[in-house]
Amino acid sequence: MALDNATTTKALQLGCGVISTVGDVFAQQFAGRKAIIVADKTTWHVAGAKVAEILARDGIATCEPYIFDEPEMHAEWKYIDRLDAVLAQTDAVAIAVGSGTINDTTKLCSAHQQRPYMVVATAASMDGYVASGASITKDGKKQTFACPAPQAVVADVDIIAGAPEAMTASGYGDLFAKVPAGADWIVADVLGVEPIDPTPWDIVQGGLHDALSDPAACRKGDPKALQALAEGLMLGGFAMQAYPRSSRPASGAEHQISHMLNMDHFVMANGQAPSHGFQVSIGTIVSLFFYEQLLQTDFSALDIDALVNRWPSLEEQKKASLEMFRDSDFPTFAAGEIEAKYSSPEELRRHFEVMRDRQDELKCRLRKQLLTVDQAI
């Protein structure tokens, strides 16, 4: 069902040994086209060289592979400029061999050339493989740039099982984030802000708890558990293709916390920036804690008049934001976001009244959706 509802991705091979199908998939999806492999030094050795071998075996014409040689590569605009220049010199269809950074870089650069691409996944590390859009840091800000999802995906569980444990943990964290993200959509649905669309909701949430049920097996590299994890991550992207209005089906407040950490150049004690999945895991814990407090709140006891009267005006919030981020890389960015998403006092009053009048329904749905902080950690 998920692939049937996808608007861009037409082919998915997921399972053990499916790397052998890469030539057939390319020929079926891009008949008569040349291929150019895009990888970094690590993913070239993990799968890129094998992909090149299979393409040659199957008679697929190829250009010289483009291999980023940085020891540590992040999704930054300087790499977009470099790959743009490479792809502009050929009409070949790119095959991204990698995970988050390689995929998003290739995705956006292919869109700049107005051509499709495919991806060979090397880790179950994040949910963005088949998402429409690429998360790239530009001018100090983590931004999502609109661009089509891959037309084809090959995800070999045997290759994914060889990824570093931290990458699998990152993917598990990104998938777990769908739990509070679903709760956010429930709240938006009850408030009448954004009604739940049952198709993308079911794509993401239908098998979510089962996919999360055995983290120990994922850690051990168990093929069945890893395939369930990879499938769950792919489903998040398919849901976003089926719901082009926003990333609502697969992300919520926890992803906003991830973006904030990126924009603040947050690093761990070892000086390294945490992966996207680890960042949203931090956001997930924050969101789950918030929901624990919300579920303990009696909304019938709220003094709505007092709360609305204390609500800062748009200008007050923008002024506070400009002061807060004055010395950052993005002094005006947050103020722009506030202006785009500001709720008026009238809207805020209506939201509080709905939460008061429908709190039993809201809390029942949230309890069914959520896990506790203790369960999460």
Q: Each PLM stretch: what is its role?
A:
Residues 1-93:
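ATP/NTP phosphate-donor binding region
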Residues 4-6, 29-30, 86-89, 110, ...:
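Solvent-exposed alpha-helices and their adjacent loops that cap or buttress functional pockets
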Residues 38-39, 98, 155:
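Short beta-strand/turn micro-motifs composed of small residues
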Residues 46, 104, 163:
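Residues that form or flank phosphate/diphosphate-binding pockets in enzymes
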Residues 87-109, 113-123:
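A short, small-residue-rich loop immediately preceding and capping a beta-strand
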Residues 111-210:
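A glycine/threonine-rich phosphate-anchoring loop and its flanking beta-alpha core
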Residues 201-359, 366-373:
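Active-site segments that bind and position negatively charged phosphate/pyrophosphate groups
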